[in-house]
Amino acid sequence: MDRVLSRADKERLLELLKLPRQLWGDFGRMQQAYKQQSLLLHPDKGGSHALMQELNSLWGTFKTEVYNLRMNLGGTGFQVRRLHADGWNLSTKDTFGDRYYQRFCRMPLTCLVNVKYSSCSCILCLLRKQHRELKDKCDARCLVLGECFCLECYMQWFGTPTRDVLNLYADFIASMPIDWLDLDVHSVYNPRTRSEELRRAATVHYTMTTGHSAMEASTSQGNGMISSESGTPAISRRLRLPSLLSNPTYSVMRSHSFPPTRVLQQIHPHILLEDDETLVLLSPMTAYPRTPPELLYPESDQDQLEPLEEEEEEYMPMEDLYLDILPEEQVPQLIPPPIIPRAGLSPWEGLILRDLQRAHFDPILEASQRMRATHRAALRAHSMQRHLRRLGRTLLLVTFLAALLGICLMLFILIKRSRHF
């Protein structure tokens, strides 16, 4: 972006767009300002023909120069397609539709931590992989925004605070033409949809009022009240728009409908139920309208069947076997104290706190930590062995030099005595 247009043309374009200088490079806001100024400066609307022509010329040059930034690097080798200027109207959000924010970042906490090595195929991780490929294939030591559209280049250009960086970066990429990102839209992460057979056979029936993810709640979809017909069980690791930061309601938590109350009370007696057929989760979540029971539980022959009486079964005594299997001393499990969120936290910080608390009970993470500890101990032992070998070589060299010095002194004394006699 620093090499797009001259300094005078930059100032003139920003003056015509009526934007501050710090927004230079924000394609979405510049395009929105261009559309507004085009309506004001159009000759049919009473505007100036000269100013309109100058604005169109500078804006067209700006888009062409941004398009050529990565093309001038050469040797990228991973471009999927390159269209002409007529195909630049298709933005990234228009390409992926209403599920753009779900496909933009699969798991915020994991995708933000795995900077160098990630097998994720969301838009955030794919753009980071492009950054490394551009450095390797194009021998580009320093990349700026325009040559690369990854999160790090975005933060380096705009200096965005960490609190809202992912939300602002998602909006920045959403308005960017998909052709400029060199992304294969078929390889981008796409949540799989559940088939109708799996949805009917599932024990937990997801209501049709679960809504979209938190970042889609402020879009034109009715603040997340329109449900997703795919029936995909959404995870709570979702993003959130900056406009929702002032209202700390976690709309990412979903309202589920379960089988009748008596079944739930037998399986989970600690669950709090508010009506006869609907399970209500904890309070900090958006209140969705409830679906009528006749839509949740259609009448069928299986519902009319009476529950069979349970018969008591006799089991063989296996106390001795259990004593052999169980360890002699039980290892105490350290349960970390719950993380209590402070007042005034954004939903994004609340999600991270819940993920951190969940990580203490994740068996995969525990196994990974044990492997890291073993690897660290092996490296420490290897470094100790290497230090001992280096010390042995040093002692051997010192001994050799001392022996050589002694031989030289003996020869010197013998030669001196022979000359004396």
Swiss-Prot record:
It comes from Murine polyomavirus (strain Crawford small-plaque) (MPyV). It comes from the Viruses. The modification Phosphoserine is found at S257. Residues 12-75 form the J domain. The chain crosses the membrane at residues 395-415. It is a single-pass membrane protein. Keywords: Early protein, Host membrane, Host-virus interaction, Membrane, Oncogene, Phosphoprotein, Transmembrane, Transmembrane helix. Residues 1-394 are cytoplasmic. This is Middle T antigen. Residues 416-421 are extracellular. Interacts with host Ppp2/PP2A A and C subunits; this interaction alters Ppp2/PP2A substrate specificity and localization. Interacts with host Src, Yes1, and Fyn. Interacts with host Shc1, Plcg1 and p85; these interactions lead to cell cycle progression. Interacts with host 14-3-3 proteins. Its main location: host cell. The NPTY motif is required for interaction with host Shc1 protein. InterPro entries: DnaJ_domain (IPR001623), J_dom_sf (IPR036869), Papo_T_antigen (IPR003354), Papo_T_antigensf (IPR036092). Plays a role in transformation by modulating the activities of cellular proteins involved in control of cell proliferation and by acting as a functional homolog of an activated tyrosine kinase-associated growth-factor receptor. Recruits upon association with host Ppp2/PP2A the Src tyrosine kinase components Src, Yes and Fyn, thereby activating their kinase activity. Activation of Shc1, Pclg1 and p85 mediate signal transduction pathways leading to cell cycle progression and cell division. MT also plays a role in regulation of early and late gene expression and in viral DNA replication. It is found in: Host membrane.
